[in-house]
């Protein structure tokens, strides 16, 4: 799959750069390897992903760089085009062999699944890494944890590799995608990507412990002043997929005024008002969703943002 790096069109930006020659596109990734910021057992994903056993959790692989530029991103230390070594000193370059071993190590630590966070731009490394790990004893579901800024073609390449899609749907309009993530086409491409995900994995399947072993979880982080958009997204999802997917409606927006560009969006300098989230939660409740997660409380503290 290295040819996918020589003219990179893995995400909707279709930069077309030759990463094998050391050229970087929008995301900043180069070479034929994956850059991994951290591997860990993660206890704070949705319960059907992380489980409730304190000795287990989701076997999470955090990849460096990102195809979006979310102005409110909590992980800017590892998501930027150029990484700051002082803030992310432990980033490792991994080929398919070393990445497959990382998956096996997480399985040995008791992970419920292998959770690939921000993986889009490393797809040509991930697919053979999963295959190699399975040849060497990996028996866990593979979770593709994505921003939703994907092409249907890239998702199609993951058929047979991914069991669970954990996918954001961030925005309802092109204007919001452009303003907050430098992605005016986000609201267009995400729906085609989700449709391909559903074509592959179908309705949710749970094991006897309530752990998801196949299916789709759609996340939506409710942003300040965007409750209308949140309801539109949830409504469209329900109209198309009904109770065949898991809905995760998040109330954890955290203002980070120190992030570059944040001052241009005063609405994002405030936490989500409780009544805004309640409006969205009430709308979801009226739909009688069978599989849905709602969050109580307020924005997460910066102390919960990982140290890289």
Please report, for each region that a protein language model flagged, where it lies by residue.
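Conserved Radical SAM active-site core
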Residues: 27-160, 164, 173
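Anionic-ligand binding region
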Residues: 177-209
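Auxiliary Fe-S-binding modules of radical SAM enzymes
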Residues: 1-23, 202-308
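Short glycine-enriched, charge-decorated loop/helix-capping segments at active-site entrances
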Residues: 77-91, 179-184, 262-271
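Non-cysteine beta-strand/loop elements that form the S-adenosyl-L-methionine
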Residues: 159-174, 246-252
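Hydrophobic faces of well-ordered beta-strands that scaffold small-molecule active sites
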Residues: 59, 114, 142-144, 165-167, ...
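Conserved glycine-rich "GG(E/T)P / GGGxP" loop and the immediately following alpha-helix
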Residues: 107-132, 179, 185, 195, ...
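Conserved radical SAM core fold
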Residues: 79, 123, 148-151, 169-187, ...
């Amino acid at each position: 799959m290295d040819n996918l790096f020589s003219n990179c069109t893995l995400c909707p930006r279709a930069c077309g750069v030759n990463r094998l020659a050391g050229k970087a596109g929008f995301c900043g990734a180069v070479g034929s390897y994956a850059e991994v910021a951290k591997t860990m057992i993660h206890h704070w994903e949705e319960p059907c992903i992380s489980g409730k056993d304190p000795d287990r959790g989701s076997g999470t692989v955090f990849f460096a760089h990102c195809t979006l530029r979310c102005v409110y991103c909590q992980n800017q230390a590892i998501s930027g085009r150029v990484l700051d070594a002082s803030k992310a000193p432990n980033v490792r370059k991994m080929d398919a062999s070393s990445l497959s071993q990382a998956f096996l190590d997480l399985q040995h630590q008791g992970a419920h699944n292998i959770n690939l966070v921000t993986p889009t731009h490393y797809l040509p490394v991930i697919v053979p890494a999963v295959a190699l790990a399975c040849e060497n004893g990996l028996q866990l579901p593979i979770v593709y944890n994505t921003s939703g800024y994907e092409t249907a073609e890239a998702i199609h390449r993951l058929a047979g590799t991914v069991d669970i899609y954990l996918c954001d749907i961030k925005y309802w309009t092109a204007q919001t995608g452009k303003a907050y993530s430098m992605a005016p086409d986000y609201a267009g491409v995400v729906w085609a990507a989700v449709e391909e995900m559903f074509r592959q994995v179908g309705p949710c399947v749970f094991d006897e412990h309530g752990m998801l072993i196949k299916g789709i979880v759609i996340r939506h982080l409710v942003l300040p002043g965007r409750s209308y958009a949140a309801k539109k997204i949830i409504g469209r999802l329900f109209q198309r997929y009904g109770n065949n997917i898991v809905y995760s409606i998040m109330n954890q927006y955290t203002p980070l005024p120190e992030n570059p560009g944040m001052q241009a969006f005063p609405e994002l300098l405030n936490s989500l008002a409780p009544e805004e989230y309640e409006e969205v939660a009430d709308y979801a409740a009226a739909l009688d969703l069978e599989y849905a997660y709602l969050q109580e409380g307020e924005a997460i503290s910066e102390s919960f943002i990982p140290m890289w």
